[in-house]
A protein has these predicted regions:
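Conserved, hydrophobic alpha-helical core segments of structured domains
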Residues: 1-85, 91-94, 177
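Charged substrate- and nucleic-acid-binding regions of tRNA-handling and nucleotidyl-transfer enzymes
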Residues: 27-33, 88-178
Length: 178
């Protein structure tokens, strides 16, 4: 996608803004022509789409990214980012590579420690929310709220703490409250 997105600024410096989206679109068409299976094509498309997305090298940010993608995707993403870094200018290359290494270490820690990054990892479930008086869509919304609280380090993944967190942060859409 870079050739199609190439621009030169007033200082004569080349830029390839938003090339990842053009590249993903092109890859999607090429992968269809090659008759690559849908799961592999989707995976490749997402890698290309995400490869220019800069994840801050914090545990919270890596945890959030891992909640959206699985561990293998994160590691492949980092390899693509590493290759992309080598394809760029030398400017701050070592710092960028060190940051990618740090993100990989954080991802491995999160995986090894079995940290909570999915609803099924929570120490609370739909039955607990039913007992708290939640029903229907509110159960899923409450669990999502709890997961985001754990990922963002606002609450520990402990049943009673999660119940309290949900109670104090959930905005019910009751007919009486409208």
């Amino acid at each position: 996608g870079k050739p199609r997105m190439h621009t030169v600024d007033e200082n004569g410096i080349s830029h390839f803004k938003k090339h990842q989206f053009q590249g993903a679109y092109m890859a999607e068409k090429i992968l269809k022509r090659l008759r690559i299976d849908n799961a592999s094509a989707k995976y490749i498309y997402e890698l290309i789409w995400e490869h220019d997305n800069r994840i801050p090298a914090t545990k919270k940010s890596v945890r959030r990214f891992m909640a959206q993608h699985d561990f293998d995707f994160v590691m492949d993403y980092l390899e693509v980012r590493r290759a992309d870094t080598y394809a760029q200018s030398d400017y701050k290359r070592q710092e960028k590579l060190a940051e990618l290494d740090h993100i990989a270490e954080l991802a491995m820690e999160i995986k090894e420690d079995n940290e909570c990054i999915h609803i099924c990892d929570l120490d609370i479930n739909g039955k607990d929310l039913l007992q708290m008086g939640f029903g229907g869509k509110d159960i899923g919304i409450g669990l999502e709220l709890a997961l985001n609280g754990v990922i963002d380090e606002k609450v520990e993944n402990k049943k009673e703490e999660l119940k309290g967190y949900i109670e104090s942060n959930f905005k019910r859409q009751d007919k009486d409250n409208t």
